[in-house]
A protein has these predicted regions:
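Auxiliary Fe-S-binding modules of radical SAM enzymes
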Residues: 1-23, 77, 83, 205-306
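Residue-level signature of catalytic and energy-coupling elements of molecular machines
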Residues: 18, 51, 147
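Hydrophobic faces of well-ordered beta-strands that scaffold small-molecule active sites
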Residues: 34-41, 90, 122-124, 145-147, ...
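Glycine-rich, proline-tolerant flexible connector loops at the mouths of alpha/beta enzymes
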Residues: 34-41, 61-64, 91-104, 155-156, ...
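Conserved short loop/turn motifs at secondary-structure junctions
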Residues: 39-42, 96-97, 126, 188-190, ...
Length: 306
């Protein structure tokens, strides 16, 4: 499907149009099937970066559980469990700006484990990559790499000072250079303006990811954004999702962390009109819904599980 290549003004006008009309427009790009994926937090905490939303940053006293890289048997067990829940894609996620050199060979062995489970597609989220790392991941058969932009370029300095928006985009380009699929999304509700949400949609359209994970901020105590409970409401979440889908018709919009900030009714509405994927189970440092509830919701909507 050819991208519409709408201008910022056109997307903003869509954002501010009647909600029913907006959702009707976005629904034209939605398939009748929903993808399920899942993750394992394979290394937790002690991250050197100062992302203001993140429980895993060593800059904040968030009291989360920290641990080194999981071994192969633990990852394989988690992937097989995710498969029983209906996931067809599974990702290893590690904390930190990028993979530590001494850990990278272990990470590659985890990719091999992911690829060994029949019927599952491998994914990894390891932070910022250099050329050699991206090449090695591709050589080991990694199907998809996840790396969010998190917000738009103009707002990025407000959420992080230890790396740049451009560093993130560079990693996205490396992923595509070496033939891997790209999963690249955002976190909504971090204080961005409506105009900046439009910028996110347009910047993602330039990157052209295969999947766009949509996270909604779940404020973590002891982080700088701990009081950001009211930066986006349910209607504006729906409006943002619709505009993202219209601007990125070929990408699968995916519900990820924080979607419980939407009512069950609005989660269903989003799945009808703009969202085609769900991360099932728990997230990195927050709790998700029971997979059985998500399966039931999708079936009630008359959609197939991919």
């Amino acid at each position: 499907m050819e991208s519409l290549k709408l201008s910022k003004k056109e997307l903003l006008n869509l954002y501010n149009s009647e909600l029913d009309e907006l959702l009707e427009k976005s629904s034209k790009f939605v398939k009748d099937e929903v993808e399920f994926c899942s993750i394992v937090n394979a290394r937790s905490g002690k991250c050197s970066q100062d992302c203001k939303y993140c429980a895993q940053s060593s800059h904040y006293r968030t009291h989360i559980e920290t641990y080194p890289l999981l071994d192969k048997s633990e990852v394989e067990k988690a992937e097989k469990e995710a498969k029983t829940f209906g996931a067809h894609r599974f990702a290893v996620v590690t904390s930190g700006k990028n993979p530590a050199e001494e850990d990278f060979h272990k990470v590659l062995s985890l990719v091999d484990v992911l690829n060994s489970v029949e019927g599952m597609n491998s994914c990894a989220s390891l932070g910022i990559l250099d050329d050699e790392m991206a090449k090695k991941l591709s050589e080991h058969g990694l199907k998809r790499y996840h790396h969010n932009i998190n917000t738009c370029r103009s707002y990025y300095p407000e959420i992080c000072s230890t790396h740049t928006f451009d560093e993130r985009v560079k990693t996205c380009k490396l992923v595509k250079k070496y033939g891997m699929e790209l999963c690249c999304g955002v976190i909504l509700g971090m204080g961005e303006t409506v105009e900046q949400r439009i910028e996110m949609a347009m910047e993602l359209a330039e990157i052209e990811p295969d999947s766009i994970p949509i996270n909604i901020l779940m404020p973590i105590p002891e982080t700088p954004f701990e009081k950001y409970h009211d930066k986006i409401d349910e209607e504006n979440i729906l409006r943002t999702l619709a505009v993202f889908k219209i601007a990125n018709p070929n990408a699968v919009l995916r519900f990820c962390g924080g979607r419980m900030r939407l009512s069950d009714e609005n989660q269903r509405l989003a799945l009808k009109t703009c969202v085609e994927g769900i991360m099932i189970g728990n997230y990195l440092t927050t709790i998700g819904k029971e997979p059985s509830e998500d399966i039931a919701m999708v079936k009630e909507l008359g959609k197939k599980i991919k």
